[in-house]
Amino acid sequence: MPASSRSKRVLIYSHDSFGLGHVSRCRTIANALVEADQSVSVLILSGSPMIGSYEFRSGIDFVRVPGVVKQIDTGEYDSANLRVGVEHTMEMRTRIIRDTADIFRPDLFIVDKEPLGLRGEVGPALRLLKDRGTPLVLGLRDVMDDPAALAQEWERKKIVPALRDLYDEIWIYGLPQINKPLTGI
């Protein structure tokens, strides 16, 4: 079906670490998109065990990837529920994210907080969609970590090349006069 005769599609990757802020923010964005344009379909990718508890407007659905949890004592990740190693869980998550992007064929892909996802899991989907010409957006909250700490983390994770080579836009959620989270990067 030609892109012009099908509904507009937005894929959102919701970082699913501890807390509900990421899923709540993605839900708010999804609800605003379908409210603004009833021809839009939004699909949210998340590993949050709480995503199914949220109420979504018509035109929104979600794919829950296998969950992971960060161990408080070690800072390492582990599979949340499955009795498989975290590497196996991450491989499943990466494939589900990429395959969902491939099949859903979004007109826009929004990634929340983590530019490459947890352990780079969004990278294959980003490259696939970039090759197709899909606009790629990184969404960041207005208040983030200390700039020096964030710069070190992004250097270690090789984020700056991904921002330059993959993303078309970076959206900052919040009031620009309050905070500029990319200062110092």
Region locations from a protein language model:
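An aromatic- and histidine-rich active-site surface loop
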Residues: M50-G52, F109-L128
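Active-site-proximal region of nucleotide-activated glycan assembly enzymes
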Residues: G123-I185
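A short, glycine/small-residue-rich beta-strand->loop->alpha-helix junction that serves as a flexible
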Residues: S14-R27, I51
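Conserved nucleotide-sugar donor-binding subdomain of glycosyltransferases
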Residues: D78-R119
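Conserved nucleotide-sugar phosphate-binding/catalytic loop shared by glycosyltransferases and other
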Residues: S7-K8, S14, A32-H88, M92
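Hydrophobic/aromatic beta-strand patches that form the interior of the parallel beta-sheet core
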Residues: L43-L45, D61-V63, I110, V137, ...
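Conserved acidic residues
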Residues: K8, R105-D107, D168
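Histidine-anchored nucleotide/phosphate-binding helix
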Residues: V23-V34, G123-L129
